[in-house]
Amino acid sequence: MPSISHPPSALRDFLRSEAAGGVILMAVAVLAMIVANSPLADSYFHLLHVQTGPVLSEKLGPMTPHLWINDALMAVFFLLVGLEIKREFVDGRLVTWQQRRLPFIAALGGMAAPALVFLAVTAQSSGLTQGWAIPAATDIAFAIGVMALLGSRVPTALKLFLTTVAIVDDMGAVVIIALAYTASIKGIALLAAAVILGAMMAMNRAGVRHLAPYLLGFVLLWFAVLVSGVHATIAGVLAAFTVPVVATPGAPDSPDSPLHRLEHALHPWSAFLIVPLFGFANAGISLEGFSLGSLLEPLPLGIAAGLFIGKQLGIFSLIWAAVKLGIAQRPRGSTWLQVYGLSVLCGIGFTMSLFIGMLAFASSPDLIEEAKLGVITGSLLSGVLGYLVLRFAPPAADAAQAETEIDREIEQDGDVEAIEGKLRQ
């Protein structure tokens, strides 16, 4: 059976853009915190909430920069998430069930354990249970950004495994947003969204390969979903699933594969503009009135504990169990301590956790601020501990050989089956 070749630079380009974007996101988050607690604070919050557009949705009210970022630009971010998910399942590292097994197991543990920890911590507090999904998310840009600071100390196999787990995690987050955080529905708008989505699927079936019709459909679908009451970012994922994908050996910009072209084009915009803007608009927390004791309030404590304790516990324990039971194999060239470090890094939930927090407590600004405090605290603890573990973890005995083999496959052949073989022991 002939091997399937992939763009030789795609994986490296992805890791490089995510790593650089993660570093920028860290800087922007720190900047937002500084501005929100400086003499510029009033201007910062006023700028975010000044009316800059009409009322597109009765639920949202007049559009503001904050809403344009969270409900429009983030729809583009979710479009990219959807493209990544589809590519991985059709033409990437999740093509076969054998390849999907360990990432799915890890992501399951990484979503269930944080939610259970959150519910346990907040069990005695009323009105907080809807925040159970906040610590279940992983911020791939932040995590890869931390790994970038470690350079070659982190095996390539672990970096690729992290991206795969995060993509599966994103799938779960999308389902949660669609099912758990949708209130009242407007039937006519939802029907219009279904018709638009059906038309986009029909274009795919008819062999339409130009991107313009799909992008137009995405905009129309976004508006219909926004009006319907379902969160508008879901439109991005749904639209992505209709974009055709065609294997394009060695040619990520080939016109034969609209999905590869669109994903390749959106990555820098997402990594260097959309996600940093989201971070700047949402990470700014005024610490006035907060104290160290505020971290012990049920909501921030539950979120921080879910991210810092639940994530590492859920991911590492299920990976360990899967390997010991012979269900899957540990990424080649890595040690158990490095796998633990990766599990800790997955507790960086920044972007997606902040996003879910605002959906969970949309009617309570005070709880949103508490949720932000918990997300930032849990993410910071996870980032610092994950960095230290990976920084001082000794390399595996076969690390150099595995790294050489994996690099050769990625840079020269790009053969997905060969790469996956090298990534497993």
From Swiss-Prot:
Q: Which family does it belong to?
A: Belongs to the NhaA Na(+)/H(+) (TC 2.A.33) antiporter family.
* Keyword Ion transport attached: yes
| Database matches in HAMAP family | NhaA (MF_01844)
Q: Which keywords does this Swiss-Prot/TrEMBL entry list?
A: Antiport, Cell inner membrane, Cell membrane, Ion transport, Membrane, Sodium, Sodium transport, Transmembrane, Transmembrane helix, Transport
Q: Does the keyword Transmembrane apply?
A: yes
Q: How does it sit in the membrane?
A: Multi-pass membrane protein
Return the Gene3D superfamilies for the record: Na+/H+ antiporter like domain
Species name for this entry? Novosphingobium aromaticivorans (strain ATCC 700278 / DSM 12444 / CCUG 56034 / CIP 105152 / NBRC 16084 / F199)
Return the protein name: Na(+)/H(+) antiporter NhaA 1
Q: GO CC annotation: what is one? A: plasma membrane
Please provide the Gene Ontology terms (biological process) for this protein: regulation of pH
